[in-house]
Amino acid sequence: MSENKKNVDLNKVSYNFGTKGWTVIGFEIVMLFFMTGITVDGLNTIVPMMAAFHGWNPDVLLSISTPASIIALFACVLWAAFIEKAGLKKTTIITMVLAGISMIAYGNSVNIAMYAVSLVCIVTFINAFACNCGFAICANWFPTKKGIVMGITTIGMNLASALINWILSGLSNSFQISGALSILGGVVILLAILLGIFVKATPEEAGCYPDNDPEIAAIIKAEEEGVKEMEKVSYAGALKNKYVWIFGLGAGFFGLATVGIMSQLVSYFMAARGYELTGALSMLTIAAVIGMIGSWAWGVVDQKLGTQKACLLFGIWYFVGIAFLIAPPTPCMYIGLFMLGGAIGGNGNFLPSLAAQVFGRKDFNVSYACMNMINGIVRSCSFFVLAVLRSMTSGYTVPSMVFAVIAVIGGILIVAVKEKKAIQ
């Protein structure tokens, strides 16, 4: 190990990212806000309003969301190839503009077929710019501070959970749902223009150092020079790599547990705890707000302990939190709600951090695309697992504890594989 490496603490928690680094982080927060807000949480408002506006069946509209997500999931794997061919920044801008146009078309759909096609386009392009491209830019800018940066950027997901339905409702009251989605689509296009002006794909292009640290820059330059002649990992190579599969499955188990718990949280508070709908929704909002702190906190744990150890602790935290949530005493329920909120905040942090840890800046795009596909396939099984469990048992205890165990298994899977780092 060189003297440079001996004198640098790669696990140090630091927020000295510089103006341009914080600009990158700010854009990614907003990008993840739109991803979660429009493709997940916003559907609570969009679907019933679109159905009422057009006289369509809301159940039919909602049923389109699942195949749209699956189609987008496989389409997003291909974005790594586009990034290699067109460049990371250009791909980001193009997908943002296409997402904005798709949102405008979505809001102004004249029939269900147009609704379905535009929704597939939205999910595909938003996931492309927020995850495939956005996380790749962050991996380039913050190669050793990935944990804390992912913790900060994923706050955007929780902001969306807390705010998007208020934003959509407010805009719809003035402009109808078609106008609301058109305005938000225009905002995404404006965001693409601003990104084109203020953000570079790598810190070197912006005249900055990775992690805003010249010592880190020297280490990375030496590491990347050592593998310069090696070919970049291919799709086939990534899909043969054990880290891609194990990390994709492990993170997928976290996502499966999160969707399984969150999808029944409102009904749990109403049926098992006696809350009215307004009170149950308030508990959901509280969990989302706590999740903002959780995003940052799990980023700190990731940075200090390493991503794989953080994943194991996350799985255990999830298990204990769910156990408290469903325990009969009311104080236990509040402890569980706090822990669950912290868990949903950290849920989005780990997969891009794991990809950056193992594959570094050079091979992040393809490896993350493949990991994310595996993660998405596992996560999409959540409703099937929930349906099977609910058909076998009554109440919420058994399904909740099964999801809690699944979260622990995810953490064990990730920590069980030998730690590998692109930057030592």
For every predicted segment, state its role.
Residues A113-F129, C332-G346:
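Hydrophobic core of transmembrane alpha-helices in multi-pass small-molecule transporters
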